[in-house]
């Protein structure tokens, strides 16, 4: 007997459609203004650090695609109880990473690239476990790309260095607002 599920088919079509349209207009459906400002600042940091506009665009586009797909999966109730526990763990790790990034930005001489890189790597691993059975290997590659890019100790050291002070300030302002509003 053939197993057919219109709900599964609709979810698959929605993910496919959204992956093709991962631009600014679709992102605003799932990503609020403050998050968008943080993403814009992360793009600028990536562009300045890599000296490559296409590479910076790719990493942010991958980040948006992943965020949108995970939001669609969550909104459609695709995660089971154990996966919801993983989603909670991911959110806690992401929140811990944001609070650590803020602390490093606000207190002079406390920055440690290894600590922040470790937290981002933990986030990556939990997210990969969460979406293991829901997203394609290509999406798993996007997750690795995004987290590996932003957990690069060289990029993190540059971000907390004197040349990126303005960017770091804007990122910290956005993270603080997201934490205060309970969105992170």
Swiss-Prot record:
Give any single GO term for biological process.
negative regulation of inflammatory response
Q: Which GO terms describe its cellular component?
A: lysosome; nucleus
Q: Does the keyword Phosphoprotein apply?
A: yes
Q: Which residues carry this modification: Phosphoserine?
A: 3
Membrane-crossing residue ranges in chain numbering: none
Q: How is it modified after translation?
A: Phosphorylated by TAK1/MAP3K7; this phosphorylation triggers association with BTRC and subsequent ubiquitination and degradation.
Where does the record place it? Answer: Cytoplasm; Nucleus; Lysosome
Q: What is its main location?
A: cytoplasm
- Tell me the domain comment: The central region was initially thought to constitute a DED (death effector) domain. However, 3D-structure data reveal a previously uncharacterized fold that is different from the predicted fold of a DED (death effector) domain. It consists of a large, hydrophobic central cavity that is poised for cofactor binding.
Q: What protein does this entry describe?
A: Tumor necrosis factor alpha-induced protein 8-like protein 2
